Amino acid sequence: MAKDPGRVLIFDTTLRDGEQSPGASLNLEEKLAIAQQLARLGVDIIEAGFPYASQGDFKAVQRIADQVGGEEGPIICGLARASKADIKACAEAIAPAPRKRIHTFIATSDIHLKHKLRKSRADVLKIVPEMVGYARSLASDVEFSCEDAARSDPDFMYEVIESAIAAGAGTINIPDTVGYITPAEFGDLIIGINKNVSNIDESILSVHGHNDLGLAVANFLEAVKNGARQLECTINGIGERAGNAALEELVMALHVRRRYFNPFFGKDSESPTPLTAIRTEEITKTSRLVSNLTGMVVQPNKAIVGANAFAHESGIHQDGVLKNPLTYEIVDAKTVGLAENRISLGKLSGRSAVRARLEELGYDLTREDLNDAFARFKDLADRKREISDRDLEAIVSEQVMQPEARFKLHLVQVSCGTALRPTATVTIADQDGIENTAVALGTGPVDAVCKALRSLTNEKNDLIEFSVKSVTEGIDALGEVTIRLRRDGKIFSGHSADTDVVVAAAQAYINALNRLVYSLKKSSLHPQHDVVKANL
């Protein structure tokens, strides 16, 4: 059997696989903010990125390793393809972290070998021990993944795994790269590895999975029952295509059903010892932070963190919950950090109260960023009686956590009505502070604003999504707008919140456009799609 640490290790890949979601691109400060919150959440390993992809990715991993990694903190991990250049860059990026890991991989399925890598099985059996050994010479903690393991020939994969462990891999990861496998099959796959890999007891077994068939979490739980002790997951389940296994769902399944899972760890079913090291009360704020910074909206009926996860419409359900929450709720909302504000913030609140609440929400702002956020808070407080946590989150993500600004919005003015053709006047400033103004007509005020902005910026793009939602309740609620732009097949998200949704739409468009322009400055490789040309 594989090594058993006595609990499940949570390997968070929000900053690597999660960021590969269309439109979820993050800048360095946003990645750092998420990494710091992941550390508060208690994840065991943070996969901070793919350092070889670009200089920007390298710097982000390096900064996280320096500022988030610690003797008592999470292991900081970087991804590397099975190539010396990738592995060397990864080792250099994670070097500042006291506890660090190199995660290298190569595909093992015949379809990937033939059509992507154009390599034989013999080639892979030669590359794996060489590259794992090289990684092991640079770091004491090495993880190896068999990409597309779910569609690989088991006997060949056993051979690859055995060679990786012999070369120094302390963790073996089994990815369901395309979300193909079913729970029973995944359990059998883990059983087969434990049974047929002679040196598996020298390594921890890990799993990674995508949600293309909606089975990722179920697959992982079956893998845990059969010996997997590391779960690679993301906050809110974000990731390529249909996403990854959701961290919050996995953790709470193991928490709520601990008595069921305990025997699979050799424990008494009544053992109160948690099966993960996650601080569950940090789940909600982590979910909201990731949603705000990526622009990836959490669906209302999403388990654990969706807006409706603890809502009851039926009268019968409401009556039962009022008498005893356990009648219809298997999770106490407070367990995942869903609680009312302890401090009521309004126009008389000072900087210290705002800073304290932001710190509780997971935001560690610089003095300059705090000044910007506080100025925005005071502006909003003049228009709203009370400021909620969601308002604060919207302020920070809009005002502070934004990409380098090439364009800044200075003026939005619209005229519309039953007898008027919607007209927008917009003024923006470029990075040199030069202002330009445009006027445009549209089918509505938002359409007119977007047309004016498009004419001012001269950046080609297609607006593929516009959505607006109320951040809080009441007539004075903030309206949060999300806009997605597409260019050359890539998607860029922008979001903003304001009591005036037209202003929010204009700022969201500018934010998306700044992300688009920022991305043009860096040319990033994709760890799976870009093939290593030579192992040099």
From Swiss-Prot:
Q: Which cofactors does this gene product need?
A: Mn(2+)
Q: Where does Mn(2+) bind?
A: D17, H208, H210, N244
Superkingdom of the source species: Bacteria
One GO molecular-function entry: manganese ion binding
Q: Does the keyword Flavoprotein apply?
A: no
Q: Which family does it belong to?
A: Belongs to the alpha-IPM synthase/homocitrate synthase family. LeuA type 1 subfamily.
Q: Please list where the region (Regulatory domain) is annotated.
A: 408-536
SMART domains with a match to the protein in the record: LeuA_dimer
Give a short account of what the protein does: Catalyzes the condensation of the acetyl group of acetyl-CoA with 3-methyl-2-oxobutanoate (2-ketoisovalerate) to form 3-carboxy-3-hydroxy-4-methylpentanoate (2-isopropylmalate).
From the UniProt record, give the pathway where this protein acts: Amino-acid biosynthesis; L-leucine biosynthesis; L-leucine from 3-methyl-2-oxobutanoate: step 1/4
Q: Name one GO biological process term.
A: L-leucine biosynthetic process
Residue span, Pyruvate carboxyltransferase domain = 8-273
- CDD domains per record: DRE_TIM_IPMS
Subunit structure of this chain's protein: Homodimer.
- Name this polypeptide is given: 2-isopropylmalate synthase
Keywords from the UniProt entry: Amino-acid biosynthesis, Branched-chain amino acid biosynthesis, Cytoplasm, Leucine biosynthesis, Manganese, Metal-binding, Transferase
**What reaction does this enzyme carry out catalytically?**
3-methyl-2-oxobutanoate + acetyl-CoA + H2O = (2S)-2-isopropylmalate + CoA + H(+)
Short name of one Pfam family for this protein?
A: LeuA_dimer
| Segments crossing the lipid bilayer | none
Localisation: Cytoplasm
Enzyme Commission number(s) of this protein: 2.3.3.13
A single GO CC term for this protein reads: cytoplasm
